[in-house]
């Protein structure tokens, strides 16, 4: 299961982040890949320093303020936030992200797109699933969140430049099926409240959600 989050960062913040990133230096992205993934990874990453620290802080705050992200991911921690850049000819072949990022279990991965989709060709995030491949290329400021266990790749960029922020989430709820149940209950409770306000039925849904989270959460 994956989710498309719209407007995680508004256009003004996207411009600010792009300015910050544009002033920084980049290093070979292979330095942060595992032994197997390194063989298929050809991109660049913003070097360590104050700029990438600022980007990490702003993106973390933006995600944690986005109701859809919080509901879907149930985040406990965000780790290893990186800024990646793909220029003409660069790509990242099929791979699986590490189970542990920064010593923490990684349940979900995210990609926050910062380049306008019409400013580059190629560069789609390609997810491998039971029904085949799904290509994802979002507006600047939008993000996609998906299972870290999924095989995925970044298609070769054939024109322009693709800049994105990527990172990993340890969820309060380890199992994806349980996270999906809680996410569905969030949607139901929001719809009930919008339609009828506070009712007995809404209270029962909220009680059920809270009790399930109490059973499943790893705090």
Swiss-Prot record:
Question: Where does the record place a coiled coil?
Answer: none
Q: Which co-factor is required? A: Fe(2+); L-ascorbate
Q: Which residues bind Fe cation?
A: 95, 97, 152
> So where does 2-oxoglutarate get bound?
162
Q: Which GO terms describe its biological process?
A: DNA damage response; intracellular iron ion homeostasis
Q: What is its EC number?
A: 1.14.11.-
Q: What class of enzyme is it?
A: oxidoreductase
One of the Pfam families matching this protein, by short name: PKHD_C
Indicate the segments forming the Fe2OG dioxygenase domain, all copies: 77-171
Q: Oxidoreductase: present as a keyword of the record?
A: yes
Mind listing the UniProt keywords for this protein, alphabetically? Dioxygenase, Iron, Metal-binding, Oxidoreductase, Vitamin C
Comment on bound cofactor = Binds 1 Fe(2+) ion per subunit.
Name any one GO molecular function. Answer: L-ascorbic acid binding
Q: Which PANTHER family match?
A: PKHD-TYPE HYDROXYLASE YBIX
Concerning NCBIfam families, the annotation shows: PRK05467.1-3, PRK05467.1-4
Q: What is this protein called?
A: PKHD-type hydroxylase Mmar10_1675
């Amino acid at each position: 299961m994956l989710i498309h989050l719209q407007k995680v960062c508004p256009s003004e913040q996207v411009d600010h982040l792009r300015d910050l990133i544009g002033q920084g230096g980049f290093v070979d992205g292979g330095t942060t890949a595992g032994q197997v993934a390194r063989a298929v990874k050809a991109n660049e990453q913003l070097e360590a320093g104050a700029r990438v620290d600022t980007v990490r802080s702003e993106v973390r705050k933006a995600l944690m303020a986005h109701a859809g992200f919080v509901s879907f991911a149930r985040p406990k921690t965000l780790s290893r936030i990186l800024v990646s850049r793909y220029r003409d000819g660069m790509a990242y072949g099929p791979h699986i992200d590490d189970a542990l990022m920064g010593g923490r279990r990684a349940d979900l991965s995210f990609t926050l797109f910062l380049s306008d989709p019409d400013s580059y060709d190629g560069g789609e995030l390609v997810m491998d699933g039971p029904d085949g491949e799904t290509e994802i290329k979002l507006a600047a400021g939008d993000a996609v969140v998906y299972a870290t266990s999924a095989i995925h790749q970044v298609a070769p960029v054939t024109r322009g430049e693709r800049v994105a922020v990527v990172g990993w989430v340890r969820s309060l709820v380890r199992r994806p099926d349980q996270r999906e149940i809680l996410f569905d209950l969030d949607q139901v409770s929001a719809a009930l409240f919008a339609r009828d306000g506070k009712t007995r039925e809404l209270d029962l849904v909220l009680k059920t959600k809270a009790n399930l989270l109490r059973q499943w959460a790893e705090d």
